[in-house]
């Protein structure tokens, strides 16, 4: 018979008492994410954050979050291959105000455009907007057959590719450097820059599927709450006798109106 302690008898019970299960969601709260006024749909979703406690403030944890949203959801559109990045810059009440932070195409759209028997032409350029944003803009285009062409391939010569790339850089630089960020985003939504490039390059070589396929924000100007509020259509529209609704329309307020007292803050 083996000599030793019987572990089952000497042990008082299971190691450690049963811990109380705490639902982590009880310490969190939801915030509404608002898109800038350039887009048709302003309410793009909700985000979760831990409640303010001691020195840890909820709004500080929200600032800097990046939300990637399909343009179809932002514009109530069927074109789904463009994605916009929106960065949280300010928190007002339960609303998170965002600003443009980048744009890209979906992977499947890029893959579907690349085919045999044609030349792919890419260009990128760093441009500064009038309000101080430094953007890196990437353009892409593909050659296509000329009218009544019998030949299967439509390869462009090296000199033609260089000329088209130069034209791309010129048009992108002109369109971005002469506008502020709001106007640039308004051009990116329908991709009017890509259409201008396609039209201008017809004399060099016919192109199709000319798109701005990516935009990166390299540098931003110093943060200004006033400019962000203007971007959201809430800067100069509020008056003493009127308030601005979520869609940007002025709503008359009754004289002597006071907001209801909140029970919990």
Curated annotation (Swiss-Prot):
Disulfide bonds, paired cysteine numbers: none
Predominant location: cytoplasm
Keyword annotations from UniProtKB, A to Z: Cytoplasm, Ribonucleoprotein, Ribosomal protein
Any GO molecular function: structural constituent of ribosome
InterPro entries for this protein: Ribosomal_eS1, Ribosomal_eS1_CS, Ribosomal_eS1_euk
Localization annotation: Cytoplasm
Pfam families registered for this protein in UniProt: Ribosomal_S3Ae
GO process terms (BP): translation
Any one of the GO CC terms: cytosolic small ribosomal subunit
Comp. bias (Basic and acidic residues): 247-256
Entries under SMART domains matching the protein: Ribosomal_S3Ae
Spans annotated as Disordered: 234-256
Entry's family note: Belongs to the eukaryotic ribosomal protein eS1 family.
Assembly with partners or alone: Component of the small ribosomal subunit. Mature ribosomes consist of a small (40S) and a large (60S) subunit. The 40S subunit contains about 33 different proteins and 1 molecule of RNA (18S). The 60S subunit contains about 49 different proteins and 3 molecules of RNA (28S, 5.8S and 5S).
Protein name according to UniProt: Small ribosomal subunit protein eS1
């Amino acid at each position: 018979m083996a000599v030793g302690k019987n572990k089952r008898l000497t042990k008082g019970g299971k190691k450690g008492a049963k811990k109380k299960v705490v639902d982590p969601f009880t310490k969190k709260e939801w915030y509404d994410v608002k898109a800038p006024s350039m887009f048709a749909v302003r309410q793009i979703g909700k985000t979760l954050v831990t409640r303010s406690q001691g020195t840890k403030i909820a709004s500080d944890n929200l600032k800097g979050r990046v939300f990637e949203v399909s343009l179809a959801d932002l514009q109530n559109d069927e074109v789904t291959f463009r994605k916009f990045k929106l960065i949280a810059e300010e928190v007002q009440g339960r609303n998170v105000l965002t600003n443009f932070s980048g744009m890209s195409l979906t992977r499947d759209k890029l893959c579907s455009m690349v085919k045999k028997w044609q030349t792919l032409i890419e260009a990128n350029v760093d441009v500064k907007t009038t309000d101080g944003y430094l953007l890196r803009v990437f353009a892409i285009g593909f050659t296509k057959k000329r009218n009544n062409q019998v030949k299967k391939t439509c390869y462009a010569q090296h000199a033609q590719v260089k000329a088209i790339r130069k034209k791309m850089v010129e048009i992108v630089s002109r369109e971005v450097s002469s506008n502020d960020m709001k106007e640039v985003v308004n051009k990116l939504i329908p991709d009017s820059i890509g259409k201008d490039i396609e039209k201008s390059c017809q004399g060099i070589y016919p192109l199709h599927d000319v798109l701005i396929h990516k935009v990166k924000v390299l540098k931003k100007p110093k943060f200004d709450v006033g400019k962000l509020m203007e971007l959201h259509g809430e800067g100069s529209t509020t008056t003493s006798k009127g308030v601005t609704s979520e869609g940007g329309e002025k709503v008359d307020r009754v004289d002597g109106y006071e907001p209801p007292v909140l029970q919990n803050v």
